[in-house]
Design a protein with these regions (language model features):
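Long, positively charged leader/targeting segments at protein N-termini
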Residues: 1-16, 20-29, 34-40, 78-233
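Short peripheral tails and domain-boundary helices/loops at the edges of structured domains
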Residues: 30-76
């Protein structure tokens, strides 16, 4: 049976009752008081995010915010390498270690695409990931994750992350990210707990306040939302 317009598909709180983060966001990567504080201090001290490539326009019709993608990839790779000590261990342990992404193909595999536009796109994406990794390594030195770990994390972010304009961040949302596996994925919206946002709600200052206070949740509703999932792929 088809779902009705506005019906909730899935909803996830951004923070739990103790104000601890549930979602892994680019904001948390720079939060020196959060669970990623050790990484955040290094990222902020080295101004690492300013070294990334920013927003890149793509001939496929949508931009790639590589700064946010690389920032989130760094945090994800770090969490994987921390193992038992990772804050998001339960989440990262469930992520597949093989990602269906052209940027993960080796040269021999790409040769099979000879003559296709995909091969050039894959090469550009691989070069971009290498550039972002080199910026990471130059800033963090020996504390940087391995290139293979970073490359996997970057591909995972592009496959699963949501851009949340209302919270000005990109996020990996445990559970909800399963719906973000295609360009036509349902849209998402940021809501107050117990309150449904609509297009006529102009109380932007209040929206910022509830987001900062941890009273936000990300919800997928049929046909409703401000940010199309998958637009950063």
């Amino acid at each position: 049976e088809d779902m009705a317009q506005g019906e909730v598909i899935f909803s996830l709180r951004m923070r739990d009752d103790d104000d601890a983060p549930i979602a892994l966001t680019t904001t948390e990567v720079e939060n020196e008081r959060g669970p990623l504080r050790t990484l955040a201090k290094m990222v902020n001290a080295t101004r690492l995010t300013s070294r990334y490539s920013g927003v890149i326009e793509d001939e496929w019709g949508f931009p790639l915010d590589s700064t946010r993608a690389a920032t989130l990839a760094l945090a994800l790779a770090r969490e994987v390498e921390l193992g038992d000590d990772a804050y998001w261990r339960a989440y990262v342990d469930l992520l597949p270690r093989e990602v269906d992404s052209l940027q993960m193909w080796d040269d021999d595999e790409l040769e099979a695409l000879q003559g296709s536009r995909l091969i050039e796109r894959a090469r550009r994406r691989r070069a971009l990931v290498r550039r972002e990794y080199e910026a990471t390594r130059e800033a963090l030195g020996a504390t940087a994750p391995s290139y293979e770990s970073f490359r996997w994390a970057y591909a995972t972010v592009l496959a699963r992350a949501f851009v949340l304009p209302d919270l000005n961040c990109m996020a990996l949302l445990p559970g909800l990210d399963l719906y973000n596996s295609a360009r036509d994925a349902e849209k998402c919206t940021v809501e107050r707990l117990g309150h449904v946002e609509d297009d006529d709600d102009e109380d932007d200052d209040e929206d910022v306040a509830f987001a900062n206070e941890g009273e936000a949740q990300v919800t997928l509703r049929v046909g409703i939302g401000g940010a199309a999932a998958g637009t950063q792929l």
